[in-house]
Each structure stands twice: as structure tokens, then as C-alpha cells.
Amino acid sequence: MSEDHTKADNLSEKDPHSPERSDSSSHEDAHAREEEESSDDDGALDGKPASLIAIVMIALSLAVFLSALDTTIVTVALPAISAHFNSTAAYTWVGSAYLLANAASTPIWGKLADIFGRKPMLLLANALFMIGSLVCALSINVGMLITARAIQGAAGGGLLTLVDTIIGDLFSLRTRGTYLGMIGGVWAIACALGPIVGGAFTSSVTWRWCFYINLPIDGLAFGIIFFFLKLKTPKTPILEGFAAIDWAGSFFIIGGTLMFLFGLQYGGITFPWDSATVICLLVFGVVCIVLFGLVEWKFARFPIIPLRLFQYRNNCGALLVAFFHSFVFISAFYYLPLYFQAVKGATPILAGVYILPAVLSTGVSAAATGAFIGNTGNYLIPMYFGMSMMILGYGLLINFDAGSGWAKLIIYQLIAGIGNGPNFQAPLVALQTKIKQSDIATGTATFNFVRNIATAISVVAGQVLYQNQLKKMTSTLQQLGPAASLIAAGDAGANTQAINALPTPQRDLARSAIADALSPMWIMYTAFAAAGLFCILLVSKTELTTTHEVTEVGLEAQKKAEAERKAERQAKDLEKAQKS
């Protein structure tokens, strides 16, 4: 299935250091690199002391841990924050500002890392994250807090993308799977620990510690990265570097993403889905994204998301698998806590504890997948295994009802979690097998951008389906009297205390209704997992090399790569002309 693609890749990925190049060209390139790069070595960690690898990976893991933790740490603290500032806007926007900025900024970080270097951009993202965290902790009004959360989110988008990119620079294709799996496990565990940590701080100290806690941890990560991470750092002139940024593409992708996600955020909550506001946001968001594609195709010299990433079936398959995997797995972290609070009567903190079977099994299976890929060089087996287990696990969640016992609740979560883990990073390894080393940053940023969009759409799709199911139960819910409005609104997550305070017969009826409304949602997620399984058929098998390939970064490297691509296109055009 992959033979043609492999041949095409071999043609398009000719070694830029092959003997075919002239001596003068090699001399010019060496001179350019000498002028451009600092004294850092090539950054390869393959074969380096295990202690050095451990130190660097701890720092990278801490950065990703904080980025993921802040995605969910405020969920339990939001009522206290809203009460402190006496603002209903805080309940919606303190959480959303982080997620929106995170998603919109992700594509930009990859190209910034190509132009200015990985290490400077990672340090910048860490610094911005610390600044945002400090301002959040010291906020004196809700506007200040929301703005700081947006800064945090933009930095958080850079942390995950840059860490994945740097691992691609530090290790060979064969080795990097181990460390990408580790990062995937850290991300999953941090996301799930957020509500527990946030709830503990809010109840025992103050909600401000949800942000203070980032400072010492991120400071430690910053210091380790600064002193121990050795990567080639280009001496790109600031003004020349900024002039090379695809500003038109940045405008359209950020604007389009924000409008689209704002439309999803407002739809069915702030405004009806058929309102002019929601329709305009969604339509113009899509239009901007289409215009972004046009800019990348025709006008951008150094595209943020180069369309050449999509020229191979393998790459499209890997991105589709990432989309469907993200669409499905986020549902467990988002809707299982709702089930435990609204149906099982758990507090927010206990709900976080109750989903630990899914969390821990996700983290362990992600790390185990990385080790498997590193030892065997096979990423397709984990992809098939993971999606198959997701189909089984999320299919079993359909059976969760008001009377489900703990054996069922734990075992079914474990199965779903085992399915979650493998496809956090295996599709990324698959993607990186078919792109040049010079495209690692933009490819990784595109991968994470697809994930962010998938999770945003997934949460809204689940909520819409859940609300529609409750509307079908109107006659049943009328037996609850005034409390029916709490359930029928589809906002049971915000009204769990009121539901749990109902008299026993009404409470049992409400819990059964919510559990029944969640079942069709799990059916949808199971179907999407099945779609993801079929998409793996598009992914080709490629031998993972153990040879480390040095990544050239900086503006001169971008210009050289552009010239090589132009020469390749001209050669192909000439070959076609000769054949015709």
C-alpha cells in the first residue's frame, strides 16, 4: 500500500548533503551556517548519558504538565472566582480564554521556531506562561484575569507544540517514539489532575494558588532548559525575521479559528444556534480558514501550514486519526465527571478522583506505546490496537446508568483509558516519517492544531446531543415539578447541587434521565472511534531510522529549503515535459 508513497518520498527528500552538490555550494552553505548558528551542538541526545536525557525530559515534561494542568485546573474554582469578582462573565471566560488562545496560537509557534530557533521560542513560551500565571494570581478585576488567562493560553499552545518539535530534533525517528509517548502520558494525566488540584487549592487555601503553583514549577523548567538543552540557535536578525513571518496567514488562521470557536462557544448557550451572531461567527470563521488556505497555497513565502504536508495519503491519514482520537478521548475527561456529579452525586473533587481509572490507564498506555515504538519501530500496531480498544471501551460506556456498580465503572474506564493512550503520539510519529526534517515544526504544529479543533468541536457536539436527548424526555421530566427546568436546560453540570438536594424519588428520576441522555452521546463517540480506525488504513508503514538527522533552523535555512523545493518542482516539471 505504501510503496508508491515511499518512492515519492525518497525522490522528494533527497539528501541535501549528497555528493551531487558542488563544492562551492557546500562552502557557501557552511559559511551561512557559521554566520547563522551559535556555538550550541546539534542537540542530538541519542547515545548521550542517561542522566542528561533524564534532566532534559523532566524539564520538557514539566512544561507540558503545566500547559495541560491549566486547561482544567480552574474548572472547580470557577464558582469561587465568579463569587470573588461578583461576575457571571468570569464563569464562562476564565476557562474559555485559555482554550481559545491555546488553539488559535498553536500554528504560529511552529513557524516562529523555524525562523528564530526552538530553544529561544520555548524559553519565550515558558516566560509568557509565568507572566500570565503571575498576573492571574494577582488579578484585581475579572478583565485583568481573563486577559492573563489568554496570555497563558497562547503560551500553553507553544509549550506542547515546541516540546513535541524539540523531541523530533533531539532523537532519531526510532527513538523519539519513546519520549513522545512519555509526553502524551504526562499531558493526559495533568488534564485529569487539574480539577483535583484546583479543588484542593480552592477549598483549603485560595483559588489564586491555582496560578501561583505554576511559578516555581515553570521556573525550574525554564532554568533546566536554559542551561541543559543544547540546540542550534540561529542568529536571525529580529526585523528580518519578523518580516519573513506569514502575517496574512497568521491573521486569517487566528481570526478564523477564534470566530469559529466563538460560534461554538456561544451556540445554544448565549445565543440560539440559528441566531445571526452564531451563524455569522461560524460562517465567517470557515471563510477565513479557506482564505488562509489560499494564502498558504499562492502567496506565503514561508507558510505557517504548508500545503505540501497534505500531498501524501499517509499524512492525511495521520491527521485524520489525530482528529478522531482527540474528538473521542476528550469526551471521557469532560463528560465522565458530569456523570459522576449528576448521576452518582459526587462532589467536583470526588468526580476527579472517580475518573482516575481512565486517567491512569491512559497515561500508562501512552507511555507503554512510546516504549513499544522505540523497541520495535512499529507505530501501526499501537494505532490499530488503540482505536480498537477505544471502540470497545466507549461502547461499554453506553451501558453506564444510574444503577451501575463500581466494578463496571472501574473496569469500563480502564478499557477506555487503555484505548486512549496509544494514539496520543503514534500518529505524530507516522506523520513525521513522511515529512522532511525541515518541516518537523510546522508539521507538529499542524498536528496539534487539528487536535485542538477536534476537542473544541467534540465538546460542543456532545453537549448538543445531550441537550436534544433531554428535550425528548419533557413528559418524563415534568414529574419533577419546578426542578424540571434545571434538567431540561441541559446544564446539569452547573446544577448538580440542586439536583442532589431533591427528595429521593425526584432525585432518582432526575439521575436516571441524565444517565439516559448521556448514552446516545457515547454511541456517537463510539462511531467516531470506528471512523478513526478506518482512517488508519491510509497510514503507510515506514521503517523508523535510528540515524539522527540534524535540523537546520533560522531564516537562511528556510531560504535554502525553499530553493531546494523550487529546484525539485522544476526538475519534476522538466521530467514531465520530456515524457510528453
Curated annotation (Swiss-Prot):
Glycans are attached at residues 10, 86. Residues 1-45, 559-580 are annotated as: Disordered. The keyword Nucleotide-binding does not apply. Residues 1-34 have a biased composition (Basic and acidic residues). It is a multi-pass membrane protein. GO terms for molecular function: transmembrane transporter activity. The chain crosses the membrane at residues 49-69, 89-109, 127-147, 153-173, 181-201, 209-229, 242-262, 275-295, 318-338, 348-368, 380-400, 409-429, 444-466, 519-539. Induction: Expression is positively regulated by the dothistromin-specific transcription factor aflR. It is found in: Cell membrane; Vacuole membrane. Signal peptide: none annotated. The keyword Transit peptide does not apply. Keywords: Cell membrane, Glycoprotein, Membrane, Transmembrane, Transmembrane helix, Transport, Vacuole. GO terms for cellular component: plasma membrane; vacuolar membrane. Disruption phenotype: Decreases the expression of ver1, pksA and vbsA, and subsequent production of dothistromin, but does not affect the resistance to the toxin. Residues 35-44 have a biased composition (Acidic residues). Efflux pump; part of the gene cluster that mediates the biosynthesis of dothistromin (DOTH), a polyketide toxin very similar in structure to the aflatoxin precursor, versicolorin B. One function of dotC may be to transport early-stage dothistromin biosynthetic intermediates from the cytoplasm into vacuoles, thereby affecting the rate of dothistromin production. PANTHER family: DRUG TRANSPORTER, PUTATIVE (AFU_ORTHOLOGUE AFUA_3G08530)-RELATED, MAJOR FACILITATOR SUPERFAMILY. Belongs to the major facilitator superfamily. TCR/Tet family. This is Efflux pump dotC. The gene is dotC.
